[in-house]
A protein has these predicted regions:
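Structured extracytoplasmic
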Residues: 1-96, 103-107, 116-126, 133-140, ...
Length: 184
């Protein structure tokens, strides 16, 4: 919603065996300004972040972040470790904030914070929340929410919902090994 304007896009995302993403707009409605100036730029940023070089520099790993355990919490009914994360470099795709790690499966279930580098001069601050859900054997994005405070235009809220996952076992096996090996 921007200037009391709304926009919506339904986008099919495909992720190949290397992790690179492609996007296909299925339908769109609402404000052309919001779709073209905000949503399409977000899609392009996600495509860029999925490319191999950028992906390695933005993974939530000790190579890219410093971690500090701050406590335990229950997230979506599951016991979780809460860690503070601080990026080691300034990168628009890195987040400064907290992560929730499932205490049983050690998967990241939630990320909250702000970008390590401000995405634009025109934006004062951005708060983001990423939520993940288990889909079969995998933890995949379920919802991304962000609130940007712009210098001139005020507050912009964006919500992205992920659903209808189709996982190709052939691609998974090519990246991770045979499925039968996982159960051992």
């Amino acid at each position: 919603k921007r200037f009391n304007k709304r926009a919506e896009m339904v986008v099919r995302v495909a992720c190949d065996r290397t992790g690179a993403k492609t996007f296909e707009v299925i339908s769109e409605s609402g404000s052309g300004f919001v779709r073209n100036r905000i949503i399409r730029k977000m899609i392009e940023a996600e495509r860029e972040a999925s490319q191999k070089g950028e992906r390695e520099q933005t993974r939530i790993t000790p190579a890219n972040y410093d971690f500090r355990l701050v406590g335990m919490d229950v997230s979506d009914g599951r016991e979780s470790y809460v860690l503070e994360i601080n990026p080691k470099t300034r990168n628009k795709f890195l987040i400064r904030g907290r992560i929730w790690v499932d205490a049983e499966e050690f998967a990241i279930t939630r990320i909250e914070g702000q970008p390590a580098e401000n995405p634009s001069f025109w934006v004062r601050s951005v708060k983001v929340v990423h939520r993940y859900e288990r889909a079969g054997r995998f933890w995949l994005p379920a919802m991304n929410e962000s609130r940007a405070q712009a210098r001139i235009f005020g507050v912009t809220d964006v919500a992205i919902e992920y659903y209808d996952y189709v996982i190709s076992i052939r691609d998974v096996e090519a990246r991770c090994g045979r499925a039968e090996e996982w159960s051992q």
